A protein has these predicted regions:
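Short aromatic/hydrophobic "clamp" motif used to bind/position activated sugar donors
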Residues: 86
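Glycine-rich, basic loop-to-helix element that forms the pyrophosphate-binding segment
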Residues: 64-81
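A conserved acidic beta->alpha catalytic loop
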Residues: 33, 41-50
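Active-site acidic Asp-centered loop
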Residues: 42, 89-91, 171
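Acidic helix N-cap motif at the loop->helix transition within catalytic regions
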Residues: 18-21, 46-54
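N-proximal low-complexity "stem/linker" segments adjacent to membrane-targeting elements
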Residues: 1-28
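Conserved nucleotide-sugar donor-binding catalytic segment
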Residues: 130-213, 217
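Conserved donor NDP-sugar-binding/catalytic core segment of glycosyltransferases
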Residues: 94, 98-129
């Protein structure tokens, strides 16, 4: 066990009474002991808070207040984190096995800033969504987000200068992934499934407003040439998903 690695797992949630217990259980059951759990609730109106209260003994911090969206909630968790590694788990997702944190910790050598693996989608309604999302940290990031946040473990130090942009609805993680790729951070790919994820989320919706957000994000991050390429590529992605959805 790498005792120098301490994980802070952040679960952002809102009205997640049907799924949040499974997410919590998947963290509690991890065999790796150097971890803490922060749950950031957006002032839920269902039974979520009662579930969180019942799990207080296993939760380091519960924040329950209105937020500006999921990235605002995640940022609150990062600011409160005590661990040197950040992991974000969706309230309707769960870690794929009890040994995930143990496996990840083995590969966080001092020069590594990001360890990533694959995720598995469930409840797929859109055939364009792959069952297994295979991750990569490569030039493909210029065209699409080839890293899934629920498959990524970040050094807390990555967020010292910049947190997730809370103005983005779904591209806050892609935004920073691009920044870090351009900045050439050191990463390690773990060839295993990290989490099991609900595939029917916001990022799987085929709405032009979401694609416009991707274009806006890339305008701020990319060179002029790469941005112009994406001005063609992103609409083509939208049309393809509209046709095959």
């Amino acid at each position: 066990m790498n005792k120098q690695i301490h994980f802070t797992v952040i679960i952002p949630c809102f009205n997640a009474e049907a799924t949040v217990q499974a997410a919590i259980d998947s963290v509690i059951s991890q065999t790796y002991s150097h971890k803490d759990l922060i749950i950031v609730d957006g002032k839920s109106t269902d039974g979520t808070l009662a579930i969180l209260k019942a799990n207080e003994a296993n939760i380091s911090l519960i924040i329950s207040e209105k937020d500006k969206g999921v990235y605002d909630a995640i940022n609150k968790g990062i600011k409160a984190a005590e661990g040197n590694i950040i992991y974000v788990l969706g309230a309707d997702d769960k870690l794929a096995s009890d040994e995930i944190l143990e496996h990840v910790a083995l590969h966080f050598t001092p020069e590594i800033s990001l360890v990533f693996g694959h995720i598995r989608n469930v409840h797929i309604q859109n055939k364009a969504v792959p069952e297994v999302h295979s991750s990569s940290f490569s030039n493909l990031l210029y065209l699409k987000n080839t890293l899934h946040q629920q498959g990524c473990f970040y050094r807390t130090s990555l967020f010292e200068k910049e947190l997730f942009n809370p103005e983005y609805k779904i591209f806050g993680d892609y935004d920073l992934h691009l920044k870090w790729f351009i900045g050439k951070i050191n990463t390690y790919k773990l060839d295993q499934t990290i989490s099991i994820c609900e595939a029917a989320g916001l990022s799987k919706q085929v709405k032009w407003d979401l694609y416009k957000e991707e274009i806006r994000m890339k305008k701020a991050r990319l060179s002029t040439l790469l941005f112009l390429l994406n001005c063609v590529w992103v609409p083509l992605k939208f049309i393809r998903k509209k046709i095959f959805a």
